């Protein structure tokens, strides 16, 4: 077996007389003669002070750097951006959320390539920073380890009537709807506002950040057991140190990201998402990460896996528990062990430990599924996975629904069509939405939005208004991991690309059949053909800046809304 080169790229900046200037620069940041033989490890962090999701990352980056030193490498820390979905929700800022995923992946690639770093520890806390980091790892195909910031503890609120309960940020969005509908006082709304975020960490339910942290662990890109501990828990510092050591070991063993992120690993990740009832955003992000890893992952793979993996997690937004509770009952490895024992995971895939997933799980002292937070395999919440991909005349390329929270098998009703989210929110506030309506929000897709905004503001308001189980919401945009209710997103083709959603009119009958996985517009083809005559999309909202660039490059949601 050929000898492993511990410095597959950094030799460009440390070896020979031509690297004299580069070595001089590196001496100025602390390196010396004894360090030139060490692999250089990029420690990339999306730390910021803008949101609690990322507050732990500066601390964890220091731990990762210490681990790199202990493993025999030399760490070099750099930063990238992060966008807070909780802050940017419901206004113009949400156009920039999904775009940030691409900026993160591109910026990490740029630094890693320009500075000739040999491997990376990638740290993230917010929704889009997790897939952005994993996309960068897959694209670069270097030795890489991902580390999650950890989730926030749930808040506790006492309302004016004496009621006390746990709350998360999603309760705030729903409380806004209740306040507007006159069913909650401004005083209670303020009490909830003050309680939802008691400290650092990402949103606490099985929303997008925790879903993608579970994905990273199931993919094998994070250390076993590292996804579930809360942000403030000092076990995270242990995992940070171990992650730094692990990346140097991966270089020594010649293991790179694509050795880990195989088709089987992606199937494992999908299985874990289905079992937890995770965020629909996982579909979009897994497609994009797989594309970077040159893995052929299709929407059909999600339905195939959902058919055999039961939904076990009684987790918010639809259930009762949060990620802290998952940690309390054993974390992601407990779920993976149960799925593996049931023959629902590939055990022989490689992981960042340098061992297979099966070997990792066998080395851990794991409890059985607790039966409450995570239901037993023979007593699932649903017999099939928590996400389905629909097809039909209204979504020929597909649409995504979180079946974990969809209480009806069939819903049929008249369309109420809105150009973008604001118009729908105004109609709801004015009391113009009725039970049985199918709300259609279009021109919110990857290109037409642009940016494929999340519709949490409108879905929270719908639930707060008491209509959460009585109206169906369809969009070519997407939904927050915290969205509840009858919601179908990612409709493709999107409106700006002349998808069928562009030609829906008020009063058209729309039918969704969850069991059959169909979504249909009940309008005959001759009528639709007449509507297409002379049609033109809405003009672009942005003609300059990052969103204008993004709109020109982005692909369909059915392909993960990639830009490459």
Curated annotation (Swiss-Prot):
Keywords: 2Fe-2S, Amino-acid biosynthesis, Branched-chain amino acid biosynthesis, Iron, Iron-sulfur, Lyase, Magnesium, Metal-binding. Its EC number is 4.2.1.9. Disulfide bonds: none annotated. It is an enzyme of class 4 (lyase). Its cofactor is [2Fe-2S] cluster; Mg(2+). The active site is at residue 480. It comes from the Bacteria. Mg(2+) binds at residues 85, 127-128, 454. It catalyses: (2R)-2,3-dihydroxy-3-methylbutanoate = 3-methyl-2-oxobutanoate + H2O; (2R,3R)-2,3-dihydroxy-3-methylpentanoate = (S)-3-methyl-2-oxopentanoate + H2O. Pathway: Amino-acid biosynthesis; L-isoleucine biosynthesis; L-isoleucine from 2-oxobutanoate: step 3/4; Amino-acid biosynthesis; L-valine biosynthesis; L-valine from pyruvate: step 3/4. Belongs to the IlvD/Edd family. Homodimer. Functions in the biosynthesis of branched-chain amino acids. Catalyzes the dehydration of (2R,3R)-2,3-dihydroxy-3-methylpentanoate (2,3-dihydroxy-3-methylvalerate) into 2-oxo-3-methylpentanoate (2-oxo-3-methylvalerate) and of (2R)-2,3-dihydroxy-3-methylbutanoate (2,3-dihydroxyisovalerate) into 2-oxo-3-methylbutanoate (2-oxoisovalerate), the penultimate precursor to L-isoleucine and L-valine, respectively. This is Dihydroxy-acid dehydratase. It comes from Clavibacter michiganensis subsp. michiganensis (strain NCPPB 382). The gene is ilvD.
């Amino acid at each position: 077996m050929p000898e492993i080169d511990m410095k597959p790229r950094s030799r460009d900046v440390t070896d020979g007389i031509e690297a004299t200037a580069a070595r001089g620069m590196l001496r100025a940041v602390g390196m010396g003669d004894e360090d030139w033989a060490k692999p250089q490890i990029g420690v990339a962090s999306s730390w910021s002070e803008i949101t609690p999701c990322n507050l732990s990352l500066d601390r964890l980056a220091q731990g990762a750097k210490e681990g790199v030193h202990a493993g025999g490498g030399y760490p070099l820390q750099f930063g990238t951006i992060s966008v807070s979905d909780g802050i940017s929700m419901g206004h113009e800022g949400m156009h920039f959320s999904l775009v940030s995923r691409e900026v993160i992946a591109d910026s990490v690639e740029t630094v890693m390539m320009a500075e000739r770093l040999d491997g990376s520890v990638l740290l993230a806390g917010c929704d889009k920073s997790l897939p952005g980091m994993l996309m960068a790892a897959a694209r670069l195909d270097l030795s890489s380890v991902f580390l999650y910031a950890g989730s926030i503890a749930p808040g506790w609120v006492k309302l004016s009537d004496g009621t006390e309960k746990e709350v998360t940020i999603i309760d705030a969005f729903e409380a806004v709807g209740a306040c507007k509908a006159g069913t909650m006082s401004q005083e209670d709304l303020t009490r909830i506002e003050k309680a939802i975020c008691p400290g650092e960490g990402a949103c606490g339910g099985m929303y997008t950040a925790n879903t993608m942290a579970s994905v990273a662990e199931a993919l094998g890109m994070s250390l076993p057991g590292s996804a579930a501990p809360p942000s403030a828990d000092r076990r995270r510092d242990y995992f940070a140190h171990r992650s730094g050591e692990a990346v140097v070991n991966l270089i020594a063993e010649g293991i790179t990201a694509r050795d880990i992120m195989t088709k089987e690993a992606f199937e494992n990740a999908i299985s874990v998402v289905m079992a937890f009832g995770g965020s629909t955003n996982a579909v979009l992000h897994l497609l994009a990460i797989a594309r970077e890893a040159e893995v052929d992952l299709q929407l059909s793979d999600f339905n195939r896996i959902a058919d055999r993996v039961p939904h076990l997690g009684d987790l918010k937004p639809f259930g009762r528990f949060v990620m802290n509770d998952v940690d309390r009952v054993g974390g992601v490895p407990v779920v993976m062990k149960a799925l593996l024992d049931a023959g629902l995971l590939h055990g022989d895939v490689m992981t960042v430990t340098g061992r297979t997933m099966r070997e990792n799980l066998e080395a851990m002292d794991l409890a059985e599924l607790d039966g409450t937070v995570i239901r037993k395999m023979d007593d699932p919440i649903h017999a099939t996975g928590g996400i389905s991909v629909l097809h039909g005349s209204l979504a020929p390329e597909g649409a995504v629904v979180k079946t974990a929270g969809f209480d009806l098998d069939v819903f049929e009703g008249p369309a109420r069509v809105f150009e973008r989210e604001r118009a729908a929110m105004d109609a709801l506030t004015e009391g113009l939405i009725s039970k049985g309506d199918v709300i259609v929000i279009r021109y919110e897709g990857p290109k037409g939005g642009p940016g494929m905004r999340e519709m949490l503001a409108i879905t929270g308001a719908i639930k707060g208004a008491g209509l959460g189980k009585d109206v169906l919401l369809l969009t070519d945009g997407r939904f927050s991991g915290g969205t509840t209710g009858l919601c179908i997103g990612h409709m493709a083709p999107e409106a700006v690309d002349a998808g069928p959603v562009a030609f829906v009119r008020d009063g058209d009958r729309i039918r969704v059949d969850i069991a059959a996985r169909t979504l249909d517009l009940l309008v005959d083809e001759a009528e639709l053909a007449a509507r297409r005559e002379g049609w033109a999309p809405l003009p672009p909202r942005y003609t300059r800046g990052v969103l204008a660039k993004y709109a020109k490059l982005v692909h369909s949601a059915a392909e993960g809304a990639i830009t490459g």
